């Protein structure tokens, strides 16, 4: 009887694993790459800045190590390594951790995840946004990086940066086979 229970348990687990590996999360997208231009225009201290670039995305395959196989995407900017809206002076007080002094801090564009642009419904909420980043060193010498997403209203209210345009190409409609 114990052997039958073991065989049934192993069979059920094997079937579930095979179903997961062949499921919708591992299906490749029909359109596997794309370019998505964007424009950001903002005003800071009376001066207007315009940033134009293109987010380049491609399907990278399936990651089977996550328990349920998931699609992996690569994403980068065509002309820049990153987009910093504003960099603050060193040794400024932390906005995120009371009493901490920043080694560096800046507002950057988080241009989103490749799956968002390539129409993967699992990443429909992973589009572009602004992030505030702080790099800190504690009194004991431990380095850490903290960040938080910011809305356009928060950027205007907290940092006196007026966002004039924030235009991104929309994600494509895609199918997964």
Mark where each language-model region is.
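C-terminal motif of bacterial Sec signal peptides marking the signal peptidase cleavage site
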Residues: 19-23
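Alpha-helical transmembrane signal-anchor/signal-peptide segments
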Residues: 28-45
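Short structured motifs
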Residues: 24-26, 37, 81
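Hydrophobic helical h-region of N-terminal Sec-dependent signal peptides
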Residues: 9-18
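Sparse, context-dependent recognition of short Cys/His-centered cofactor- or disulfide-binding micro-motifs
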Residues: 9, 25-27, 71
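Glycine-rich, aromatic-bearing surface loops/beta-hairpins
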Residues: 128-177
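Positively charged n-region of N-terminal signal peptides that target proteins for export
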Residues: 1-6
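Structured domain cores in non-transmembrane regions
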Residues: 35, 47-146
């Amino acid at each position: 009887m114990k052997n039958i229970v073991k065989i049934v348990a192993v069979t059920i687990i094997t079937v579930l694993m095979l179903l997961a590996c062949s499921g919708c999360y591992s299906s490749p997208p029909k359109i596997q790459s794309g370019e998505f231009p964007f424009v950001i225009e903002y005003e800071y201290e009376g001066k207007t800045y315009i940033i134009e670039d293109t987010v380049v995305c491609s399907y990278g395959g399936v990651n089977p190590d996550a328990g349920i196989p998931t699609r992996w995407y690569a994403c980068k900017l065509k002309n820049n390594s990153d987009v910093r809206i504003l960099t603050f002076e060193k040794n400024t007080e932390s906005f995120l951790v009371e009493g901490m002094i920043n080694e560096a801090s800046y507002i950057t564009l988080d241009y989103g995840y490749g799956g968002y642009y390539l129409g993967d419904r699992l990443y429909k909420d992973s589009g572009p946004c602004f992030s505030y980043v702080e790099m800190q060193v504690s009194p004991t010498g431990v380095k850490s990086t903290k960040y938080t997403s910011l809305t356009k209203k928060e950027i205007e209210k907290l940092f006196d940066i007026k966002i004039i345009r924030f235009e991104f190409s929309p994600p494509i409609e895609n199918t997964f086979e």
